[in-house]
């Protein structure tokens, strides 16, 4: 059995998934398999994946070895949003480690080799996994490199201690992710960030720091992305409220950041028209103190989402 599963949730990404596939074919270490979770695509994703393993009559689920020497597994599911793709992945992964590579991203040629070597040398039950870097298409790490003396870290500490604020790439122990999966969402809401599961695990276990490029992303920070997050706040308020509740309960969180989460929690509850907003929280004083700020934030979000 391989050490690593690379899993890719995809929805109508046939036009970018081939690039991800080619990067996996170029890997200098083939100690991995690729799991594709098709979230109800209506394009030719299934047929394209089938062609890579010479599957002539692809069913909803199939698997086979591609010419590059690694196993590809394909699972089709009804469209349900990103977190349901993660749920399906964790239910079907049986390797020691797993990492998500999005359908419009790709891996540098030696990424798997670096992951496997790092885990063989440093991995143990003490760690949740490995944290590495995302690079942009110009060859620069998002948010810069980690400090040279940072050998391990808790995920939340990167943000709280202002060590690294940009996206990173987490390679997780599968057994730990299975303990917190599935992530139960809300009917009609498809924007429940799978970081919800990651935070639960990484509040108790540190990550080994691998100061290397593990994923290349086409990262663009523009107005459309900003508007997109406001629309997500509007479209999935119960999901965001649940995430903020978790953030307030994380033992590694600080009062400052718990209060920030409380503000966002109030805002999400206002948008969701959730009358149980106070009774659901175990930090009632903090939430009550955040009410005026949360009300103001909800108004701002509603206005931003309309633009």
Predicted features along the sequence, with ranges:
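Conserved donor NDP-sugar-binding/catalytic core segment of glycosyltransferases
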Residues: 110-144
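Short, well-formed alpha-helical segments that are part of the catalytic scaffolds
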Residues: 13-26
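C-terminal subregions of glycosyltransferases and related glycan-biosynthesis enzymes
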Residues: 211-307
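Short aromatic/hydrophobic "clamp" motif used to bind/position activated sugar donors
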Residues: 98
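Glycine-rich, basic loop-to-helix element that forms the pyrophosphate-binding segment
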Residues: 76-93
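Short beta-strand/loop segment that forms part of the nucleotide-sugar
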Residues: 31-40, 73-78
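A conserved acidic beta->alpha catalytic loop
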Residues: 23, 38-48, 102
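Conserved nucleotide-sugar donor-binding catalytic segment
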Residues: 140-228
């Amino acid at each position: 059995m391989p050490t690593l599963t690379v899993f890719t949730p995809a929805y109508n990404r046939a036009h970018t998934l081939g690039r991800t596939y080619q990067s996996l074919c170029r890997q200098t270490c083939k100690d991995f398999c690729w799991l594709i979770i098709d979230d109800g695509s209506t394009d030719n994703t299934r047929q394209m994946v089938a062609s890579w393993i010479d599957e002539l009559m692809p069913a909803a689920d199939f698997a086979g070895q591609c010419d590059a020497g690694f196993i590809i597994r394909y699972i089709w599911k009804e469209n349900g949003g990103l977190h349901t793709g993660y749920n399906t992945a964790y239910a079907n992964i049986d390797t020691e480690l797993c990492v998500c590579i999005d359908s419009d991203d790709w891996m540098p040629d030696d990424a798997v080799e670096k992951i496997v070597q790092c885990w063989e040398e440093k991995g143990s039950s003490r760690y949740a996994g490995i944290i590495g870097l995302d690079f942009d298409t110009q060859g620069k790490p998002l948010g810069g490199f980690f400090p040279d003396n940072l050998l391990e870290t808790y995920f939340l500490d990167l943000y709280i201690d202002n060590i690294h604020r940009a996206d990173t790439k987490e390679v997780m122990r599968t057994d730990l992710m299975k303990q917190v999966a599935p992530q139960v969402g809300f009917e009609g809401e498809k924007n429940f960030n799978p970081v919800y599961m990651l935070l639960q695990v990484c509040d108790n276990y540190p990550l080994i720091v691998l100061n290397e490029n593990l994923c290349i992303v086409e990262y663009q920070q523009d107005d459309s992305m900003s508007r997109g997050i406001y629309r997500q706040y509007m479209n999935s308020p119960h999901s965001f409220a649940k995430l903020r509740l978790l953030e307030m309960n994380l033992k590694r969180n600080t009062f400052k950041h718990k209060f920030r989460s409380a503000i966002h929690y109030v805002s999400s509850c206002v948008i969701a028209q959730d009358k149980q907003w106070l009774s659901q929280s175990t930090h009632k004083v903090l939430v009550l103190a955040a009410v005026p700020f949360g009300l103001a934030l909800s108004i701002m979000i509603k206005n931003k989402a309309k633009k």
